[in-house]
Design a protein with these regions (language model features):
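Radical SAM [4Fe-4S] cluster-binding motif and immediate context
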Residues: 2-167
Length: 167
């Protein structure tokens, strides 16, 4: 867990300028549940910065939700922006985080301003995300051209899966 007690948290919260300009509540902060990405998109710096699939790391769902609970109880946080490169990339880990938020009945809203691994989403997961407080998913669809996505930027995204998820 980050040493937020060493930061002027009230100043950050008062400024209320999270990663995304879209917020529902007033006491917003950022956190991460994972680090890196296993996709090898040509344009993305995540692989260069964090390393590829072999360096991709997820945090324990319990520790992620412990941190959320700590933020609620200590700082009065009521909204989280997950700044992961791909919050849903490890679907099992993502589901366990959601299950734990739901189990603890945490009153938290959250979003994924950096984007989300669309290829890991299905209707059931989206419904569970909403139940756990999600109000915004950012779909990182850099092109509407399937060939360009796969061959030029090397993004493992099947465009035919996107529209049904939005409906």
């Amino acid at each position: 867990m980050p040493a937020r007690h060493l930061l002027p948290m009230e100043k950050y919260i008062k400024i209320n300028k999270p990663h995304s300009p879209f917020t529902l509540r007033k006491r917003v902060t950022q956190m991460v549940a994972s680090r890196g990405c296993s996709a090898k998109c040509y344009f993305c710096t995540s692989v260069l910065f964090w390393g590829g699939a072999e360096q991709y790391r997820v945090r324990s769902p319990k520790l992620v939700v412990d941190e959320i609970e700590h933020l609620i109880n200590v700082y009065g946080i009521d909204e989280i922006h997950f700044d992961d490169d791909n919050f849903s990339l490890n679907k099992k880990n993502c589901e366990e985080i959601l299950d734990e938020i739901i189990r603890r009945k945490l009153d938290i809203k959250w979003a994924t301003p950096n984007g989300i691994a669309v290829w890991a989403l299905d209707q059931k997961l989206i419904e569970k995300m909403a139940q756990a407080g999600c109000y915004q998913l950012t779909f990182a669809v850099e092109s509407g051209n399937q060939e360009f996505l796969l061959k030029t930027i090397k993004k493992p995204l099947n465009l035919s899966r996107v529209k049904p998820l939005l409906d």
